[in-house]
Swiss-Prot record:
Its main location: cytoplasm. The keyword Metal-binding applies. It catalyses: N(6)-dimethylallyladenosine(37) in tRNA + (sulfur carrier)-SH + AH2 + 2 S-adenosyl-L-methionine = 2-methylsulfanyl-N(6)-dimethylallyladenosine(37) in tRNA + (sulfur carrier)-H + 5'-deoxyadenosine + L-methionine + A + S-adenosyl-L-homocysteine + 2 H(+). PANTHER family: CDK5 REGULATORY SUBUNIT-ASSOCIATED PROTEIN 1, MITOCHONDRIAL TRNA METHYLTHIOTRANSFERASE CDK5RAP1. The gene is miaB. The lineage of its organism: Bacteria, Pseudomonadati, Pseudomonadota, Alphaproteobacteria, Rickettsiales. It is found in: Cytoplasm. This is tRNA-2-methylthio-N(6)-dimethylallyladenosine synthase. [4Fe-4S] cluster 2 binds at residues 162, 166, 169.
């Protein structure tokens, strides 16, 4: 008899990947995914701890689930097994049971491969099970083969953890030290997703370009080596990777952008600030001049490359001059798309202990100014595509029956009106007819 599994995923692409793997783990035990939380036998919150008040948002969601559980009890129905997974689970640990005693399982991002055993114990009336172990190779050695196809574009996690210890960030504390997967293990998973219909693979890591796997005869495989290896797979058309750190942009990786046609001309390369003073305070391990040099070398290797980045405004000690340095960097680099946020102190990080916190209204003002600049650049990038013909990978249906959506080599979403759903999963030449801030509109030639 099948049972229903509901997973709510927060945060980054890594969590999306982990959620798919949780489905794959539990499927052999009779659990099938559902989008209806009310009919779920197991409810998993796969949480993110990056943004402000992440833990409180998790507790709020758990409160809503508690009300659902109470309703089920009144109706004489069995309660669902409740699991808190991901980075909030890693950070909060036993505190989750203290504040929400109706939660059954707390499991970290490196140990969720034990979910089948943990759930089985709860079914046998165990209580409050927790697994937050960091055993580097155990996670990937115990994950199953792909059972649920991800579609035309698939994620594969190749690197986890972070050794950089930026002073604003909790990732080193929730994901652990940097660890790279076995290159052949990655290759086998890539073969699987391609055989399942994937045309594009996005390699994931907290610092994916820190990928560094030691193979036989002490050969070290870099991310560039891994990309070259994967590019040999027949029927795999596109390769991407994220998220990268500037100090790990090696010469061979930069040059690969100019020599490997399957490596897409789009790169997300977070810089966070344009001020050398703030970069040092953030412990970013590079200055703005180093970042400019990488950008110049990338554009020499691949002139049409489109760049993306992350920015934090209002880091402690940021002056008006520091913020102007960030605006100057943005204007000099010219991005295709970006993500920008107000600094929020994360408990346990050095930035949270600083006494020179920036008032909220100043952070809001700076974010508004920065986002206006970034949106202008994003719109200009999209408008530059109008009238051109671009190869688009169609990977999903739109909200209208006759609409399908794909993405360009530059990661822009493209909408077309076409009732022929057989185009999904295919790469088609599309003439771009219209551009907006967040998408393009086109027609098939």
């Amino acid at each position: 008899m099948s049972k229903n599994l509901y997973i709510k995923t927060y945060g980054c692409q890594m969590n999306v990947y982990d959620s798919v793997k949780m489905q794959d783990l539990l499927y052999p035990f009779g659990y099938e995914p559902t989008e209806n939380i009310e009919e779920a036998d197991v409810i998993i919150l796969n949480t993110c701890h990056i943004r402000e008040k992440a833990a409180e948002k998790t507790y709020s969601e758990l409160g809503r689930i508690k009300k659902l559980q109470d309703t089920r009890k009144k109706q004489g129905l069995n309660s669902a097994i409740i699991v808190v997974a991901g980075c909030v689970a890693q950070a909060e640990g036993e505190e989750i049971f203290t504040r929400t005693p109706y939660v059954d399982i707390v499991v970290g991002p490196q140990s969720y491969y034990n979910l089948p055993e943990l759930i089985s114990k709860i079914v046998r009336h165990a209580k409050h099970l927790i697994d937050l172990d960091f055993v580097e190779e155990a996670k990937f050695d115990n994950l199953p083969e792909q059972l649920y196809p991800q579609g035309a574009s698939s994620f594969i996690s190749v690197q986890e953890g972070c050794d950089k210890f930026c002073t604003f960030c909790v990732v080193p504390y929730t994901r652990g030290a940097e660890f790279s997967r076995n290159v052949e293990q990655v290759y086998r998973e890539a073969l699987q997703v391609v055989s399942g219909g994937a045309k594009e693979i996005m390699l994931l890591g907290q610092n994916v370009n820190a990928y560094n796997w030691k193979g036989s005869a002490d050969k070290i495989f870099s991310l560039a080596d891994l990309l070259k290896h994967l590019a040999q797979i027949p029927n795999l058309e596109r390769l991407r990777y994220m998220t990268s750190h500037p100090i790990d942009m090696t010469d061979d990786l930069i040059q690969l952008h100019g020599t490997e046609p399957k490596l897409m001309p789009f790169l997300h390369l977070p810089v966070q600030s344009g001020s050398n003073k703030i970069l040092k305070a953030m412990n970013r391990k590079h200055d703005r001049e180093y970042y400019f040099d990488i950008i110049n070398r990338l554009r020499e290797a691949r002139p049409d490359i489109v760049l993306s980045s992350d920015f934090i405004v209002g880091f402690p000690g940021e002056t008006d001059e520091d913020f102007e340095d960030t605006l100057d960097l943005v204007r000099r680099v010219k991005y295709g798309q970006c993500y920008s946020f107000k600094y929020s102190p994360r408990p346990g990080t050095p930035g949270a202990t600083r006494t020179d916190q920036i008032p909220e209204h100043i952070k809001s003002e700076r974010l508004t100014i920065l986002q206006k600049e970034l949106m202008d650049q994003q719109l200009a990038c999209n408008e530059s595509c109008v009238g051109s013909t671009i190869k688009v990978l169609f990977d999903r249906s739109g909200k209208f029956d006759d609409q399908i959506i794909g993405k360009t080599i530059y990661m822009q979403s493209v909408y077309i009106q076409n009732p022929n759903k057989s185009l999904l999963g295919k790469i088609i030449d599309v003439k771009i007819t219209k551009a907006s801030l967040n998408s393009l509109t086109g027609e098939i030639l």
